[in-house]
Amino acid sequence: SFELTILHTNDVHARVEIINVGSEKSDDGRQVPVVQAYAFGIQLHNYSSQEIGK
């Protein structure tokens, strides 16, 4: 996994950890990563193959 910093509209920085939780095949047969985003230990979003790799 790796970390990045995002900037909120109120100028408060939050460290977000992106965790690769595997891969799955997209509609066209490609292997695409499935990742989860966490900030302060709270899951922000679970990205699907429809959002990653296109």
Curated annotation (Swiss-Prot):
InterPro entries: 5'-Nucleotdase_CS. It is found in: Membrane. It catalyses: a ribonucleoside 5'-phosphate + H2O = a ribonucleoside + phosphate. Glycans are attached at N46. Its cofactor is Zn(2+). Its EC number is 3.1.3.5. It comes from the Eukaryota. GO terms for cellular component: side of membrane. Zn(2+) binds at D11, H13. It is an enzyme of class 3 (hydrolase). One of its GO terms (molecular function) is nucleotide binding. Venom 5'-nucleotidases (or a part thereof) may be released into the venom via exosome-like vesicles. They may be attached via a GPI anchor to the membrane of these vesicles. Soluble forms of 5'-nucleotidase might be released by cleavage of the ectodomain in the exosome-like vesicles or venom gland cells. It is a lipid-anchor; GPI-anchor. Expressed by the venom gland. Keywords: Glycoprotein, GPI-anchor, Hydrolase, Lipoprotein, Membrane, Metal-binding, Nucleotide-binding, Zinc. Hydrolyzes nucleotides into nucleosides. Snake venom 5'-nucleotidases are widely distributed among venomous snake taxa, but there is a lack of information about their biological activities. They have been shown to inhibit platelet aggregation. This effect may be due to the liberation of inhibitory AMP or adenosine by its action on ADP released upon initiation of aggregation. Venom 5'-nucleotidases are also known to synergistically act in vivo with other toxins like ADPases, phospholipases, and disintegrins to exert a more pronounced anti-coagulant effect. Belongs to the 5'-nucleotidase family. This is Snake venom 5'-nucleotidase. It comes from Gloydius blomhoffii blomhoffii.
